[in-house]
């Protein structure tokens, strides 16, 4: 009996040690996983290089370029913010090649889009959607894409970095008032340091919708109401609608008054127009169940901000 008791105690002790070892191993694995998630890169970018306009060229250079851009955007840590893998910003970079020469010169359009999830909804809302028609650069197959914030000597990586910073900064602004300032300052820095490379899109007095104009306009103090709009519209408005649709819609209506203020304070700004183009269908849907008073007020503001879409804004009244 003593032997049996000793054996039982020994066996119990062994099971306890194995259990403790299992728990310790599990904790270490979880800590490692959480640490890995906390330092995940910010972007989950889908990249497409469309070369359908280019005939009689070895297609491998376009495939290699697509892979290189994807790795450049998704493997780099662009900010000091902590992102879990599930928090990555879903975005797309569609590079349309208009011209290509064998010496590696590309003339392209770049369509950039980014979205963020709406709280408690199986729905993503578009935050940024822009077509850059002045993306020219040099790239030889298998070139490594490298980038330095302070020394800009490659237009392709400068453009990609600029939009990466812009996307992240805008996304942060939707979650906290002016939350993306530090990252948006990096986008401004890219613009300033790209002045000397002699490529289109960076100059202060170029196209009113070029890269310089876009970030300079956004960071102008006169456009602070626009940055507040991004927070109020998304965080107080859309994110609230799953829990209380009436309150969320009311907050969106209030936020759109900031859009009107932006238009009045800086009538030449392109940002209010871009916002209405991006949010057009979403706004029509949001107000499909709005009150008559809400519909009238929103229709008035939107027709003032972007009269070219009056036909669309009238759908708000018709719903």
Can you say where each PLM-predicted feature lies in the sequence?
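Flexible, glycine-rich surface segments
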Residues: 179-268, 272
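Short, positively charged and aromatic/hydrophobic N-terminal segments
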Residues: 5-6, 10-12
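Bacterial N-terminal signal peptides that target proteins for export
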Residues: 15-25, 35
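Start-of-domain marker
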Residues: 41-107, 118-120
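Sec/Tat signal peptide C-region and signal peptidase I cleavage site
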Residues: 34-40
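A cross-kingdom marker for long, charged
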Residues: 48, 234-319
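Sec-exported extracytoplasmic/periplasmic mature domains
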Residues: 70-78, 169-173, 284, 288
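Acidic/His-rich structured neighborhood in mature extracellular/periplasmic domains
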Residues: 104-216
């Amino acid at each position: 009996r003593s032997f049996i008791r000793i054996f039982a105690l020994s066996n119990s002790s062994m099971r306890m040690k194995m259990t403790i070892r299992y728990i310790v191993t599990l904790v270490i694995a979880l800590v490692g996983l959480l640490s890995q998630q906390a330092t995940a890169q910010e972007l989950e970018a889908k990249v497409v290089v469309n070369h359908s306009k280019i005939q009689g060229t070895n297609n491998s250079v376009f495939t290699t370029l697509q892979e290189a851009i994807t790795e450049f955007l998704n493997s780099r840590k662009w900010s000091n913010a902590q992102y879990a893998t599930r928090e990555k910003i879903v975005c797309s970079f569609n590079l349309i090649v208009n011209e290509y020469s064998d010496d590696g010169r590309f003339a392209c359009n770049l369509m950039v889009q980014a979205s963020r999830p709406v709280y408690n909804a199986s729905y993503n809302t578009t935050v940024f959607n822009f077509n850059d028609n002045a993306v020219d650069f040099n790239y030889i197959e298998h070139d490594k894409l490298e980038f330095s914030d302070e020394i800009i000597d490659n237009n392709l990586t400068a453009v990609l970095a600029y939009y990466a910073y812009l996307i992240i900064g805008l996304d942060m602004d939707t979650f906290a008032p002016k939350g993306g300032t530090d990252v948006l300052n990096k986008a401004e820095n890219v613009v300033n340091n790209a002045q000397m490379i002699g490529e289109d899109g960076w100059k202060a007095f170029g196209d009113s919708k070029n890269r310089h104009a876009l970030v300079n306009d956004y960071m102008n103090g006169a456009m602070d109401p626009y940055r507040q709009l991004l927070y109020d519209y998304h965080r107080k408005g859309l994110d609230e609608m799953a829990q209380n649709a009436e309150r969320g819609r009311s907050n969106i209506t209030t936020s759109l008054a900031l859009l009107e203020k932006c238009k009045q304070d800086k009538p030449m700004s392109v940002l209010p127009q871009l916002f209405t183009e991006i949010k057009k269908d979403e706004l029509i849907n949001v107000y499909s169940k709005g009150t008559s008073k809400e519909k009238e007020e929103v229709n008035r503001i939107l027709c003032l901000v972007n009269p070219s879409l009056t036909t669309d804004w009238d759908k708000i009244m018709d719903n």
